[in-house]
Every structure is written in C-alpha cells, then in structure tokens.
Amino acid sequence: MEKLLVISLLLLISTSVTTSQSVTDPIAFLRCLDRQPTDPTSPNSAVAYIPTNSSFTTVLRSRIPNLRFDKPTTPKPISVVAAATWTHIQAAVGCARELSLQVRIRSGGHDFEGLSYTSTVPFFVLDMFGFKTVDVNLTERTAWVDSGATLGELYYRISEKSNVLGFPAGLSTTLGVGGHFSGGGYGNLMRKYGLSVDNVFGSGIVDSNGNIFTDRVSMGEDRFWAIRGGGAASYGVVLGYKIQLVPVPEKVTVFKVGKTVGEGAVDLIMKWQSFAHSTDRNLFVRLTLTLVNGTKPGENTVLATFIGMYLGRSDKLLTVMNRDFPELKLKKTDCTEMRWIDSVLFWDDYPVGTPTSVLLNPLVAKKLFMKRKSDYVKRLISRTDLGLILKKLVEVEKVKMNWNPYGGRMGEIPSSRTPFPHRAGNLFNIEYIIDWSEAGDNVEKKYLALANEFYRFMTPYVSSNPREAFLNYRDLDIGSSVKSTYQEGKIYGAKYFKENFERLVDIKTTIDAENFWKNEQSIPVRR
C-alpha cells in the first residue's frame, strides 16, 4: 500500500510539471476553475476571459505598454484570470497544477521583456489589477498596498491622508506595485531613504499549493527576504506589501536645466559624476543624455539635462548647489517649490497644473515599442572616454541614457540585507532607453541591434565580473533560461543579484523544489 501511495504521488508530481502534457483547451480551463473551491458570490470561471470572449483582447492588451509584445504573432494565453478574491488566485494556481500550465503574473505589465503576459509554452495570465487597495495608517505611518495597485494610486492615497508623508519608489506612476517592489524599486528618494524594499516590513503571498501566508512570520523570513528584490514571481503570487511611509517636507523644490555639448555639457557631466553621489542626501539629480538638433542643418548634438529634487525650500537647495555644483549656475528662477505629490507629476512629465487625480488612471497614455538595458558605474569616466561616449550617442542616434546617482542611504545598507545587491561602491546606474513608434520586424531588428551595439561599446566604462544589471530593467540579452537549469540561471542571476543569487537559489530549492514558478529569467532550483 505504501509503495502504491508513493507511485501515485510521483505520477501526480510528474503530471503537474510536464508542460508537454499541458491542456490548452480554454473550455477545459474554465471547467477546471469551477471544480476548485469557490466563493458562491463570485464563481471562479466568471473572472476568466478566454479567446472566444468579446472582452478577451481588451483585457489582455490593457496592460501591455510595450508594443514589441502586442503583435498578432505574440503568443497568447489560453485565458486571462482577472482575480478579484484570494479564492480566485487559489483556483487559478490549482488549475495550473492540474492542467500543467505556466502562470504569468501581471500587476502593471511593465516587464520590459513581456514576461508577465507572454510565454513560449501553454500558459495563462493571472491579472492582479483587481487587487488595488491602499490602506494608509497615519498613526503608525504605515500602509498596506495590494500588488495590483499602481505607484500613482499609492502616492495619491498617501497624499489624501497627509502632505508630509511619502514613499520611496519609482517615477513612472503606472508601474504596478507587485513587479516594482519585487525587483527592488527605486526613485528620487533613494539617496535619502533607500529602495522601496528597504521600507517594506510585511507581505502576503500564495504558494504553489494554494496556501496563503498573510504575514512574514507565517511565510518565513527566507521567503520574505526573497520577494523583496529577488523577483517575487519565482516564489509565488504576492498579494501585497506592508510599507513604512517616510517623512517629506511640506514643500520640495524641483528643477530641470539642459545644456548641449556646445554650451558646456562636457564640463558639467564631468562635475556631476563626482557631485551627484556625494552631495546632501536630500538632493537627487538625475542626468539624461539625449540627441537634439545641432546649430547647423542636419547636425545632431547631445543634450545633457539635469533634473533634480531637493527635500526642502529653494533657498536651501541653492545653498547646496552653489557649494557642491556651482558650475551648473542654478538660479532661483530655475526652481519650483511644490508639494511632494505634485513633484510626482513633475517627474512623470505631466504638464504643470495637472490635477493629482490623474494618478488614479492605471493605464499608459501612449504605447511604444521599447527596449531597456542597464549598467552600474563604479569609477569616474574620464573626460576622454566621455567624449567617445557622446560621439557614439550621436552615431547610433536612437539611444537615450538616464544616469541615476547612488550614495547617501544607498551606500549604508549592506548588500545582503535584501536580494538587491547594488549598494556601496556604485556611483550611478545607467538605464539605456530605446523607444520607437514605427512598426515592422526590420525596424525592430535595426533598433535592437543599435541598442546592443551601444551596450557593447560601454563595456570598458562599467562594472565587470560580473557586469551588473538591474532586474527592473529586465534584459533577456544578458542570459535566459531554456531548460530551467542552475547553470543557465547563474549567467543572468549573478548579474542581477551578485552573491545573493546563491541564497535565492537555496530558498527556491527549499520552498519550490519542483520549480512550479518559472519564466525565462526566474530563479532556478539547485539540482
């Protein structure tokens, strides 16, 4: 009898993880959902959209901001499960297991490689946009935020309760909390308060067996550590996060000053490299490098734009800038004082005077074809090398760069405290941005080739062994998993997580030995 039981269990496990036996019939998926435990007031199949449903395409495309993965040839899920209750999530997980389907978990849909809504094997999308509660506790200065809420919704709900509290997270307000936090999450408050995950102290998650853990005690410290920067989709379905809100002044000061190479940008960039990571931690100054028309017809040049925010009034900002970066010659007329919540709109390029209620719109206003890559810079780039970089920018034309300064609080937090390892020793992070609007495979190949060409060119100036990368700027070019092996995973894992990768693998092997939760860049199990 014991032998029979063991054989039965082995057969069950084998069936649940073998994608070659996956059931791809959407109707069979709906029937499976209805066989699972259900909430009588909200049947499981009622929230599942299949291709024959008139709303399927609308629901699927609603959170696909990257047109590279919104084509007729893009692999489609057999269903989009728009979960509204924990029971819906449990049922979806149960059917993924029963029918040998992959689960792709989507909160905001901003995965730059489309991994939250595409797959090369039979799959369905578990859409978390129905989970968007933000519960702010002013007494404790904390909040619970569901993983399907956007950063804009989080910021707005905080501002409803207080104009002197905020949260350190991203600048794009349509980012989903679930994906943003699970990759680390950073923005213009990171030099003062660190990353999003540095201010998370609780969470809830559903595991591969449908078990629900509603706090860090029940889920265990290892799992809690892993889902704060290690890619939560490798460990389960995160329901939400308990976060610590941070103090912000009644007024912050923002500015944006641009200079071309002909106007002295090279000198300013050289000074920015030593200034931005070492200045007052209340000040964050991003540098963007873009291509603009030159003074002569048909000539292009590089525009360096310094975009800053100071946690305080403009007079104090000017004191800091005159002391640490006088070369920029920042004037009071360059500065605008505003509430922190209004600075959120400034950083996301909304026109001045836009009502903050726009933050409640979870959808991207304009979709584009997009590619992102990332790097970390640990030593100053010489003037000669900077000249070569600017020359290359003009040559490739399409690439834009954001240089985001570290230092401050980022340099004080140990690299092992969370899976996000890029702490002390980093001067700044580079985000490579390639956006285009023209459709066509040949156009896409051209722009992706330019992105890779520029990335290769930057090799001597950035980190090495490994060449580090930021998970939230996901890039399949640095490695991907075909067979879900440890050897494959280590290629990209070491770049995203450095030494923390091994602990992530150990945790994964302990709590998900069958590798139920996987994608092209998930954490592998150790075999």
From Swiss-Prot:
Localization in the cell: Secreted, Cell wall
Species: Arabidopsis thaliana
Domain FAD-binding PCMH-type: 73-248
GO-annotated molecular function: FAD binding; oxidoreductase activity
EC class: oxidoreductase
PANTHER family: OS08G0158400 PROTEIN
Record-level GO BP terms: cellular response to hypoxia
Pfam families: BBE (PF08031), FAD_binding_4 (PF01565)
Gene3D superfamilies membership: 3.30.465.10, 3.40.462.20, Uridine Diphospho-n-acetylenolpyruvylglucosamine Reductase, domain 2
Signal peptide: 1-20
InterPro entries, per database record: BBE (IPR012951), FAD-bd_PCMH (IPR016166), FAD-bd_PCMH-like_sf (IPR036318), FAD-bd_PCMH_sub1 (IPR016167), FAD-bd_PCMH_sub2 (IPR016169), Oxid_FAD_bind_N (IPR006094)
The organism's taxonomic lineage, starting at the top: Eukaryota, Viridiplantae, Streptophyta, Embryophyta, Tracheophyta
Chain positions found as Pros-8alpha-FAD histidine: 110
Assigned protein family: Belongs to the oxygen-dependent FAD-linked oxidoreductase family.
Sorted UniProt keywords: Cell wall, Disulfide bond, FAD, Flavoprotein, Glycoprotein, Nucleotide-binding, Oxidoreductase, Secreted, Signal
Residues that carry a glycan: 53, 137, 293
Cofactor: FAD
Cystine crosslinks: 32-95
Name the UniProt record assigns to this protein: Berberine bridge enzyme-like 10
EC number: 1.1.1.-
CC per GO annotation: extracellular region; plant-type cell wall; secretory vesicle
